[in-house]
Regions:
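Transmembrane helix-loop-helix hairpins at lipid-water interfaces of multipass membrane proteins
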Residues: 19-93, 174-179, 291-295
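Juxtamembrane helix-loop junctions of ABC transporter transmembrane domains
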Residues: 31-40, 44, 79, 84-134, ...
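Hydrophobic alpha-helical segments in the permease module
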Residues: 83-94, 188-192, 265-282, 295-317
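Cytosolic ends of transmembrane helices, especially the final helix of ABC transmembrane type-1 domains
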Residues: 231-235, 308-338
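Transmembrane helices of ABC transporter permease
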Residues: 18-29, 89, 157-209, 282-293, ...
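An intracellular "coupling" helix at the cytosolic face of ABC transporter transmembrane type-1 domains
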Residues: 126, 143-152, 156, 164, ...
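Alpha-helical segments in transporter systems
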Residues: 16-41, 79, 83, 102, ...
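ABC-type nucleotide-binding domain
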Residues: 352-606
Length: 606
């Protein structure tokens, strides 16, 4: 569970620079207090009242140093010089020693945490993405990074220095008249306590609002992704109404919970502040009349107390802004604390990218493999299967029989709960997952295409491939036929998710991309199930060209695509029901023969 400590640790790498920059900002705030102090002492000089003893000693030392008599002129000159140093000389240095470093720290942290976030995205287990909407994830990450970036300069550069300034004013007033200082302290304790109590309620409401916003962003992301379906069913008005209801719910939380609470806070603050200012005025005036403090101290006390109370509103504003962001920052850290997939350990290590690659013959053996996504149901049960090198093996069966799950185990997306999977006699769990996966390639039913050029997508798994190697892979996958119809050939931008390509073109691109990495094991996961006849025929020819060049595993619903497979494995309810060639299985009165009859004639055999 994320805590406030996680927000602090966000900036931990630059903690030394943070301490220096916060200290510098705080010192500048304290130094600013010398101006009202000096003005008060000038009034004492002009009204012939004594200066404070430390100041008298300092002026006397300066007089001795420059050989000038201590008089009104010297005193005024020293005080004016002090004001000049604080106001004029300090001004050009302050932005560089404060704002520059605060933003530098914030931007450095954003860069580092963005990299950490991307690493987290790349290493989270697949089930996380099955359970969480991409829009929800991206919204949480974007808000978390932005809020951290904006919050640090506000807290380190404004809130903390302002609190130090208020404390410094208390010390100044305490040295002048302790009774006034006690009232000042009590008033600030009361105001800050009430502020913190109110902000705790605001933070609770903000956590609700943050979840509502994630739901809205999630639905918006879905609308963009599925806009064709929305338009096809003419449900624009319904979707707009649903989003309006979500936005109204957010507005209710903001307006009647958060904003109303903050307005109440400001109302009480202003009432207490004005009462305290009036009370301090009366006490200071009484102390001056009684002769306990000088005229200069009277002016300085009123000026400093007014400055202190004037800081309360920006302090409250900053605290309120932090409270508004607090929930989203915690939810960002909750995302970072999500456990990475067991298959992702070491994937991002630099040595993993440069280590010597594996090389397999492609012999795969599954021995007593069982697996379930939860304890309630086993998806695969006691699977025993031997795939020889360079064989083409087809996996068929009804939907939900475990075909795709078996492939996920082979790719090490998940680990079998019982049994083992061997490749060339080695348990795949003992192999480096990155080096292992680079010897496998898969072509999905829906090929993932990035928003770039055709060449970028083709070389995704092998960026250093030559153009000749790319063209050879495209020839085998029949992508060269597609190139003739693209305006810029290999350099044509395919658009988000490959929207400028047809389904068949994306499939061919996926096959060429897989071939380019020269895998030892090539997997087709229902690669032709949603294609038209012409595209399916082209994919079949490409698959036929690949046969015998590597171990090939084909998941197929259309049995016409696997007639020439060396071995067909029929799965039923998570178990292997039949194994054999196309002709052998047709000779049995089994599941394969019934499925084949249904696809060929539309009639299901008994």
């Amino acid at each position: 569970m994320a805590t406030f400590k996680d927000i602090i640790n966000y900036f931990r790498p630059d903690w030394r620079l943070s301490v220096v920059s916060i200290a510098a900002s705080s010192i500048y705030e304290i130094v600013d207090l010398l101006v009202p102090y000096a003005i008060g002492q000038i009034l004492n000089v002009l009204s012939n009242q004594p200066l404070d003893r430390p100041l008298q000693s300092a002026i006397a030392s300066i007089g001795e140093l420059i050989n000038y008599p201590v008089n009104q002129t010297l005193s005024l000159g020293v005080l004016l010089g002090l004001i000049f140093l604080v106001t004029v000389v300090k001004a050009p240095t302050q932005p560089w020693l404060t704002s520059w470093f605060h933003w530098d720290i914030a931007l450095r942290a954003r860069r580092d945490k963005t990299q950490t976030t991307i690493a987290k995205v790349l290493t989270l287990p697949l089930e996380f993405y099955d359970e969480n909407n991409p829009g929800r994830i991206s919204g949480r990450v974007a808000r978390g990074l932005a809020n951290h970036t904006w919050t640090y300069p506000e807290i380190a550069g404004q809130l903390i220095p302002k609190l130090v300034r208020v404390l410094g004013i208390f010390v100044f007033i305490l040295l002048i008249e302790w009774r006034i200082a006690i009232l000042y302290l009590i008033s600030f304790v009361v105001i800050l306590s009430f502020t913190l109590k109110t902000l705790r309620r605001i933070i609770w409401h903000e956590s609700r609002l943050d979840k509502y916003m994630e739901n809205t962003e999630s639905r918006t992301s879905e609308l963009i992704t599925n806009i064709k379906t929305v338009k096809a069913f003419a449900t624009e008005a319904n979707e707009l109404k649903r989003q309006q209801q979500r936005l109204d719910r957010e507005f209710t939380v903001v307006d009647y919970r958060i904003h109303k609470g903050y307005v109440k806070l400001l109302t009480w603050q202003k009432a207490i502040i004005q009462f305290c200012v009036f009370t301090i005025l009366g006490l200071t005036l009484a102390a001056t009349v009684d002769g306990r403090i000088s005229l200069g101290h009277f002016v300085m006390t009123l000026t400093l107390s007014s400055m202190a109370y004037a800081e309360l509103e920006p302090i409250s504003n900053l605290a309120e802004v932090f409270a508004r962001r607090y929930s989203s920052m915690l939810r960002f850290h909750e995302f970072l604390q999500e456990p990475i997939g067991s298959d992702s350990v070491g994937l991002l290590a630099a040595e993993n990218q440069t280590a010597s690659p594996y090389k397999f013959t492609g012999k795969i053996e599954l021995s007593h493999v069982s697996f379930g996504y939860d304890d309630s149901r086993q998806v695969l049960q006691d699977i025993n299967l031997l795939i020889e090198p360079y064989q083409t093996v087809a996996l068929v069966g009804r939907s939900g029989s475990g075909k795709s799950t078996l492939v996920k185990l082979l790719l090490r997306y998940f680990a079998p709960q019982e049994g083992e999977i061997l490749i060339d006699g080695q348990d795949i769990r003992t192999l480096d997952v990155g080096k292992y996966r680079r010897r496998l390639a898969i072509v999905h039913q829906e090929v993932d295409v990035f928003n770039g050029t055709v060449l970028d997508n083709l070389t995704y798994g092998r960026p250093n491939a030559t153009l000749e190697q790319v063209k050879e892979a495209c020839r085998i996958a029949r992508v060269d036929e597609v190139m003739e119809h693209l305006p810029q050939g290999y350099y044509t931008v395919v658009g988000e998710r490959g929207v400028r390509l047809s389904g068949g073109q994306r499939q061919r691109l996926g096959i060429a991309r897989a071939l380019l990495v020269e895998p030892d094991v090539l997997i087709f996961d229902e690669a032709t199930s949603s294609l038209d006849y012409e595209s399916e025929r082209a994919i079949q020819l490409a698959m036929r060209s690949i046969q015998g060049t590597c171990t090939t595993i084909v998941i197929a619903h259309r049995l016409s695509t696997i007639r020439e497979a060396d071995k067909i494995v029929v799965l039923d309810q998570g178990r292997i029901a039949e194994v054999g060639s196309h002709d052998e299985l047709l000779g049995h009165q089994g599941i394969y023969r019934r499925l084949h009859s249904l696809q060929e004639t539309g009639e299901l055999l008994n």
